[in-house]
Amino acid sequence: MGVRKRETADARKEANKSIAFAKLNNCPTSPRKMRLVADLVRGQKVDRALNILRFSSKEASRKLEKLVLSVIANWQAKNPEANMEEAGLFIKTITVDGGMMLKRLRPAPQGRAHRIRKRSNHVTIVLGSINNTQAIN
């Protein structure tokens, strides 16, 4: 690795140390269904997002609720002296990407078979702080 590339990589690594984020990999739900729930909480304050997820009837909301609680715990671990209410935490970014696909065969007429794709997804949540000048993910 070149010197400039190493310096930018080190700078990026230092910037990520102050960011609180959480990832959920290979969640066995289709990305399309997970995005419906993720769009509900994108940009919301953390307590409001938890209420939305808690009272949603979608199955994906249960998994996202646990992920939001995890990212809050990560933020508290990185900022032990800060108060969560005073920081004004909100969901800065939430991304849902496609994950691994399990390919299965379903019998079809006349001896053929159709391929079934069982999809999974990866979810990443980054927190932001309203009252802090430094961006916290």
UniProtKB/Swiss-Prot annotation:
<comment type="function">
    <text>This protein binds specifically to 23S rRNA; its binding is stimulated by other ribosomal proteins, e.g. L4, L17, and L20. It is important during the early stages of 50S assembly. It makes multiple contacts with different domains of the 23S rRNA in the assembled 50S subunit and ribosome.</text>
</comment>
<dbReference type="Pfam" id="PF00237">
    <property type="entry name" value="Ribosomal_L22"/>
</dbReference>
<dbReference type="GO" id="GO:0006412">
    <property type="term" value="P:translation"/>
</dbReference>
<dbReference type="GO" id="GO:0003735">
    <property type="term" value="F:structural constituent of ribosome"/>
</dbReference>
<comment type="function">
    <text>The globular domain of the protein is located near the polypeptide exit tunnel on the outside of the subunit, while an extended beta-hairpin is found that lines the wall of the exit tunnel in the center of the 70S ribosome.</text>
</comment>
<dbReference type="GO" id="GO:0022625">
    <property type="term" value="C:cytosolic large ribosomal subunit"/>
</dbReference>
<dbReference type="InterPro" id="IPR047867">
    <property type="entry name" value="Ribosomal_uL22_bac/org-type"/>
</dbReference>
<comment type="subunit">
    <text>Part of the 50S ribosomal subunit.</text>
</comment>
<dbReference type="InterPro" id="IPR005727">
    <property type="entry name" value="Ribosomal_uL22_bac/chlpt-type"/>
</dbReference>
<keyword id="KW-0694">RNA-binding</keyword>
<dbReference type="InterPro" id="IPR001063">
    <property type="entry name" value="Ribosomal_uL22"/>
</dbReference>
<dbReference type="GO" id="GO:0019843">
    <property type="term" value="F:rRNA binding"/>
</dbReference>
<keyword id="KW-0687">Ribonucleoprotein</keyword>
<dbReference type="InterPro" id="IPR036394">
    <property type="entry name" value="Ribosomal_uL22_sf"/>
</dbReference>
<comment type="similarity">
    <text>Belongs to the universal ribosomal protein uL22 family.</text>
</comment>
<protein>
    <recommendedName>
        <fullName>Large ribosomal subunit protein uL22</fullName>
    </recommendedName>
</protein>
<keyword id="KW-0689">Ribosomal protein</keyword>
<keyword id="KW-0699">rRNA-binding</keyword>
